[in-house]
Amino acid sequence: MAEFYQLCRELFTTSLVLMAIAFGTVWVIYDLNTALNYLLGASASLIYLRLLARNVERLGHDQKKLGKTQLLVVVAVIILAARWHELHIIPVFLGFLTYKAAILVYMLRTVLPSP
């Protein structure tokens, strides 16, 4: 389980770093409103990642299969972006995909040989 907790910390930290870099970049290239839309989606991705890790941690101890509660985060954020006129769906959705970028960074670090 120590490896699992290390992986969770690493993915969460990488997601936070990527989120900060992308937020600053979007703010500079576009505007603050678009950057805040991105930040909303990225924050939802951190919540999603935490819920997913908690469900995986419980797997085998308390339950036999993964729950679907983490999917509620995605649905709620996309519905919020669609209903609220100040929010834009694309930056929110791309912000949500930040955790996937963190997984890609982790994969590249483990696959590619270190110097």
Curated annotation (Swiss-Prot):
Transmembrane segment boundaries: 10-30, 87-107
GO annotation (BP), single: proton transmembrane transport
Keywords, in A-Z order: Cell membrane, CF(0), Hydrogen ion transport, Ion transport, Membrane, Transmembrane, Transmembrane helix, Transport
Native source organism of the sequence: Synechococcus sp. (strain PCC 6716)
Protein name: ATP synthase protein I
Pfam families per record: CGL160_C
Family annotation (InterPro entries): CGL160/ATPI_dom
Topology versus the membrane: Multi-pass membrane protein
Role according to the record: A possible function for this protein is to guide the assembly of the membrane sector of the ATPase enzyme complex.
Species classification: Bacteria, Bacillati, Cyanobacteriota, Cyanophyceae, Synechococcales
Protein encoded by which gene: atpI
